[in-house]
Amino acid sequence: MMAKKPPKPAPRRIFQERLKITALPLYFEGFLLIKRSGYREYEHYWTELRGTTLFFYTDKKSIIYVDKLDIVDLTCLTEQNSTEKNCAKFTLVLPKEEVQLKTENTESGEEWRGFILTVTELSVPQNVSLLPGQVIKLHEVLEREKKRRIETEQSTSVEKEKEPTEDYVDVLNPMPACFYTVSRKEATEMLQKNPSLGNMILRPGSDSRNYSITIRQEIDIPRIKHYKVMSVGQNYTIELEKPVTLPNLFSVIDYFVKETRGNLRPFICSTDENTGQEPSMEGRSEKLKKNPHIA
């Protein structure tokens, strides 16, 4: 019986976009069945091992991952006896949870086990049944991971020594001035009623983690558009035909301004005269109602 062919890697464009989002080297990839704490059943994901993190995608072509698992603090990897034919099952024991993995065949199970142990223990395991070429690849990954960790430590040390001048902006202004805790409908109404204040609003997304940009364009007739801004690790990705990943929300706003050559302007209410601070949402709404043309 012929062995199953290894899964084909994702197309180059997808690979490059994922690399920009994760900022980690790809060591191994393939389909995995995952059962995390709280899962009732196994869920099927295209999985990438990048550095010491597993990234889970709904399918092979998805650019943005739906979940990730940091395995750098892996306590142990335990194999499970599977009643299913030609299937490998094992558990990743982590400090805060245990994650069950299942592969479509025993061959890929050995590969996953080998790569996971190599990057977490920083040594090639001796008790894996792999071909010579696969073992060579494990040694290559080991050297890459050692080098990556050294470079990461050096980079972290250099950053700590630098004066954090750029961080002062974030401390004083944790969110861009055009951020409002409003719904999609409320953002639309604010832009329509007060065009002199700007034509772009940053607001919370449909969940508590991500964001959305609402804009009002006047090309032929006024049009309202909405863009999703996904929080991905420490970065933010604007969901466009070609996704754009930026380091913070201030950069997201700047991107829209620059790409439209200033046609898009952040929607900004005036500050309270007495305190010099942004008014509350109720205060903003009340001021807008009383004077729709505040500067």
UniProtKB/Swiss-Prot annotation:
What does the PTM comment state? Phosphorylated on tyrosine by TEC. Phosphorylated on tyrosine by KIT.
GO BP term, pick one: negative regulation of microglial cell migration
Q: Which UniProt keywords apply?
A: Cytoplasm, Mitochondrion, Nucleus, Phosphoprotein, SH2 domain
Supply one GO CC term from the record: nuclear body
InterPro entries from the UniProt entry: PH-like_dom_sf (IPR011993), PH_domain (IPR001849), SH2 (IPR000980), SH2_dom_sf (IPR036860), STAP1/STAP2 (IPR039111), STAP1_SH2 (IPR035877)
Q: Does the keyword Mitochondrion apply?
A: yes
Q: Which SUPFAM superfamilies match?
A: PH domain-like, SH2 domain
Q: What domain of life? A: Eukaryota
Q: Where is the SH2 domain?
A: 177-280
Which parts of this chain are annotated as the region Disordered?
270-295
- Name its cellular compartments: Nucleus; Cytoplasm; Mitochondrion
What range(s) does the PH domain occupy? 25-121
Residue numbers bearing the Phosphotyrosine modification: 168
Q: Can you name one GO molecular function term for this protein?
A: protein kinase binding
PANTHER family assigned: SIGNAL-TRANSDUCING ADAPTOR PROTEIN 1 (PTHR16186:SF10), SIGNAL-TRANSDUCING ADAPTOR PROTEIN-RELATED (PTHR16186)
Subunit architecture: Interacts with KIT and CSF1R. Interacts with URI1; the interaction is phosphorylation-dependent and occurs in a growth-dependent manner.
Its biological purpose is as follows: In BCR signaling, appears to function as a docking protein acting downstream of TEC and participates in a positive feedback loop by increasing the activity of TEC.
The identity of this protein, by name, is Signal-transducing adaptor protein 1
| Species per Swiss-Prot/TrEMBL record | Homo sapiens (Human)
